[in-house]
Swiss-Prot record:
Binds 1 Mg(2+) ion per subunit. The gene is aroL. It catalyses: shikimate + ATP = 3-phosphoshikimate + ADP + H(+). The keyword RNA-binding does not apply. The LID domain closes over the active site upon ATP binding. Pathway: Metabolic intermediate biosynthesis; chorismate biosynthesis; chorismate from D-erythrose 4-phosphate and phosphoenolpyruvate: step 5/7. CDD domains: SK. Gene3D superfamilies: P-loop containing nucleotide triphosphate hydrolases. This is Shikimate kinase 2. It comes from the Bacteria.
């Protein structure tokens, strides 16, 4: 089975955790677009945003998406990759898009437990809970529009991985 899986969702949804599990179980290569950007630019995302702005970061994100897309890969995308209509279309045309959907409170709780959450610049300058509520309000429709499958990210990473494998092996693509 030769496929490309794109995992989308907000920060804290579990894209990297689930992506690594899936890649391991499928013998695919795991790629995180944020890590790819950091490696190719030799800068942190915070530094890119602080020095060049969000617009430049979004352009780098779009370039990274196309650079890393290859068969037999699980690609964990940055939370804002769906802001570009071209990116949404590209992912739908080139693979299966899995949206890990989680509530703002769950996302905020997970982000507060991650040390790297302090390294990412705030999009709004508000508390993590308020920011995640605003981000989801602005992006939920875009995530849903892009996704072939929407999965409850409140489930354990192992259950999500099992569910995605069942979808893949059943040949269901919506």
């Amino acid at each position: 089975m030769n496929q490309i899986l794109f995992i989308v969702g907000a920060r804290g949804a579990g894209k990297t955790t689930v992506g690594k599990l899936l890649a391991n179980e499928l013998s695919y290569t795991f790629i995180d677009t944020d890590h790819h950007i950091q490696q190719t630019s030799n800068m942190t995302i915070a530094d890119i945003v602080n020095q060049q702005g969000w617009q430049q970061f979004r352009q780098l994100e779009s370039q990274a998406l196309q650079q890393v897309t290859q068969i037999n890969r699980v690609i964990s995308t940055g939370g804002g990759i769906i802001l570009s209509a071209e990116n949404r279309q590209y992912m739908r045309q080139n693979g299966t898009v899995i949206y890990l959907q989680a509530s703002a409170s769950i996302l905020a709780e997970r982000l507060m437990q991650q040390p790297e959450s302090t390294q990412r610049p705030s999009l709004t300058g508000k508390s993590i809970v308020e920011e995640m509520e605003e981000v989801l309000a602005a992006r939920e429709n875009l995530y849903c529009e892009c996704a072939n499958h929407i999965i409850n990210a409140h489930l354990s990473p192992e259950k999500i991985t099992t569910y995605v494998k069942e979808i893949m092996f059943s040949g269901i693509v919506s």
